[in-house]
Amino acid sequence: MSIEIANESGVDIDTDAVLAVARHALDEMGVNQLAELSVLLVDIDYMAELNHRWMGGDGPTDVLAFPMDEGSVDHGPGESAVAGTEPALLGDIVLCPEVAAKQAATAGHSAADELHLLTVHGVLHLLGYDHAEPDEEREMFALQARLLAGWRSTRST
């Protein structure tokens, strides 16, 4: 599996941990090992610009997910993701460490923990999960929590 990461945020980030949590989530979701993912960490101004341009939002957001090769992600939430044998471009996850740090302070955990959560959140969006409806939110957030707990348990051994 190819995961590219670029930190253009100006914030010192443990990119190895971001890569590891993304890889864990993709592996646990059964994503084809030939899949490709890009993770971009950006500053608050660029995130606000992206949020406005692509989502119609005002101001920065924490994470954006841009699926690339939607035809190759032949599944619905909960089904095998990108299970084929051909390379698939999953897409891009864009994270804003500054927004993550603010959210982390409110949530009472570290900025790193928030970035890990947002990375998994972005992966799930690329795989077709959403949280627009209450039942979708429950399913997605429960899966997100399970994936994070599984990843954290591998780091503490």
Swiss-Prot record:
<dbReference type="InterPro" id="IPR002036">
    <property type="entry name" value="YbeY"/>
</dbReference>
<dbReference type="GO" id="GO:0005737">
    <property type="term" value="C:cytoplasm"/>
</dbReference>
<dbReference type="GO" id="GO:0006364">
    <property type="term" value="P:rRNA processing"/>
</dbReference>
<dbReference type="InterPro" id="IPR023091">
    <property type="entry name" value="MetalPrtase_cat_dom_sf_prd"/>
</dbReference>
<keyword id="KW-0690">Ribosome biogenesis</keyword>
<keyword id="KW-0378">Hydrolase</keyword>
<keyword id="KW-0862">Zinc</keyword>
<keyword id="KW-0479">Metal-binding</keyword>
<dbReference type="InterPro" id="IPR020549">
    <property type="entry name" value="YbeY_CS"/>
</dbReference>
<comment type="similarity">
    <text>Belongs to the endoribonuclease YbeY family.</text>
</comment>
<keyword id="KW-0698">rRNA processing</keyword>
<dbReference type="Pfam" id="PF02130">
    <property type="entry name" value="YbeY"/>
</dbReference>
<keyword id="KW-0540">Nuclease</keyword>
<feature type="binding site">
    <location>
        <position position="121"/>
    </location>
    <ligand>
        <name>Zn(2+)</name>
    </ligand>
</feature>
<comment type="function">
    <text>Single strand-specific metallo-endoribonuclease involved in late-stage 70S ribosome quality control and in maturation of the 3' terminus of the 16S rRNA.</text>
</comment>
<feature type="binding site">
    <location>
        <position position="125"/>
    </location>
    <ligand>
        <name>Zn(2+)</name>
    </ligand>
</feature>
<protein>
    <recommendedName>
        <fullName>Endoribonuclease YbeY</fullName>
        <ecNumber>3.1.-.-</ecNumber>
    </recommendedName>
</protein>
<keyword id="KW-0963">Cytoplasm</keyword>
<dbReference type="GO" id="GO:0008270">
    <property type="term" value="F:zinc ion binding"/>
</dbReference>
<feature type="binding site">
    <location>
        <position position="131"/>
    </location>
    <ligand>
        <name>Zn(2+)</name>
    </ligand>
</feature>
<keyword id="KW-0255">Endonuclease</keyword>
<dbReference type="GO" id="GO:0004222">
    <property type="term" value="F:metalloendopeptidase activity"/>
</dbReference>
<dbReference type="GO" id="GO:0004521">
    <property type="term" value="F:RNA endonuclease activity"/>
</dbReference>
